[in-house]
């Protein structure tokens, strides 16, 4: 939802204003084992989990997005590394891959902790899966995930989405489009003052 709202906000930015979006990986649940964590093991009662998921589904529907049922929380470390690979090595395919990962996880309930699932999604986005797998298996993007997650935590970022504008203004969570536009406006004002 955060991504959809950001896209809506960017569509309302005045003509002539350049906004550069830089996606960065952030590992929320590094403690989740590679095989994932059943939702029953989360620190919520079944009722709380059901309410949270229903609220998520309703909010997503308002943005024209679908959220399906997920039987577990995936360990997304490999998917994050694959995203970083795509961003750096095959940048023109990164947006499609990024979107396909979100759709796979949220709408289709796919397990992003399963390397075969990540490879399938990468293939569907047109990535060179052989090259990507070699890079991931070789640990090429391991450090990038750790570094960006550590930096984010040092800045007080504890969840996603978090949008940082002009390295000064943060909008945390899937906030309304108006909140994102306000942050963009504040960043532009500070840029003009400098």
Annotated model-derived regions:
Residues 3-105:
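Structural alpha/beta surface segment adjacent to cysteine/selenocysteine redox centers
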Residues 1-19, 23, 84-194:
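C-terminal cap of thioredoxin/glutaredoxin-like
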